Every structure is written in C-alpha cells, then in structure tokens.
A protein has these predicted regions:
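Acidic-and-aromatic substrate-binding clefts and catalytic sites of carbohydrate-active enzymes
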Residues: 9-13, 39-45
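A glycine-rich helix N-cap at a beta->alpha junction
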Residues: 17-41, 50-53, 60-63
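N-terminal, positively charged nucleic-acid-binding surface of large information/translation enzymes
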Residues: 1-32, 123
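Active-site cores that bind ATP or allylic diphosphates and position pyrophosphate for catalysis
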Residues: 3, 39-40, 53-135
Length: 135
C-alpha cells in the first residue's frame, strides 16, 4: 500500500489529520510501502513540469483569471467531450459522459497545481494500480 498526504488544499490539510491517519494504520496493522510519507506540497516542482507539456499537447489551456487569484490565469484541463468507459474492480464496466464535467481547473496558475493534477501524476509515478476512497 502506498501512503501519501494529499495536502494541496492548505485550508483543509492539518497535522492532526495526518496523525489520525498514521494512528489508524498502526492500529489496524496495515503496512505501507513509503518510509517517509510524501506530501503533495513538497512535490509541486514535479507537477509544474507537466503543465507546459499538457498545454503544448492540447490537453490543457490557460483560462481567464479565477476569482481567488485575479492577477494570474488558471490552467484548465481540456475535456475530451465524449463517453469514457473503463473497468472498475468493484462496479464492473463503468461509462460516463464527460460532456457533463466541463473543463475543470488543474492549477490556480502556472506555478500552483491543484489536487486533480497532482494525484494523477503521483499515481503514475508511484505505480498505483488500484485506489480505494470513501464515498
């Protein structure tokens, strides 16, 4: 199991939440493979490298400034606007219409990547094949 702290949202990321997660894992005896738990906030240099390539390849674009940061343009993922089908280990074959999503923000600006970008890059780099999340 890979453990990392997804702390790109500074307001909702607190040390006590991390402590609770570590205590819960220790209590259950679930092992995790990362000796030093990586934090997304410490890996922004990695995510920043991918933004220009996504833009150059036509998968993302700079959009009008967001209300939270009116001086810098946000970076949006360019939605493919089609049906996407994939195999889910729990639900079986899942299909959804990406036209319902719109082009979502993946970075507050060229220097501030958000969770939606960071988590995909981390999953790929860390060899994650299965993800379990609460619903």
């Amino acid at each position: 199991m890979v453990l990392r702290f997804e702390d790109t949202d500074k307001e909702r990321s607190k040390k006590e939440f991390e402590d609770d997660i570590l205590a819960g894992l220790a209590w259950t005896g679930l092992p995790y493979t990362t000796p030093a738990v990586p934090r997304q906030s410490e890996r922004t240099y990695i995510y920043r490298k991918h933004i220009p390539k996504l833009i150059a390849d036509g998968h993302a674009y700079e959009a009008e400034p967001g209300k939270d940061n009116p001086d810098k343009k946000v970076i949006r993922f360019k939605n493919p606007n089609k049906n996407v089908t994939f195999a889910d280990s729990v639900r079986g074959e899942v299909t959804f219409d990406t036209t319902e999503l719109g082009d979502f923000v993946i970075a507050r600006n060229i220097d501030e990547p958000l969770y939606h970008l960071a988590v995909v890059i981390d999953d790929h780099e860390m060899g994650v094949t299965h993800v379990i999340r609460g619903e």
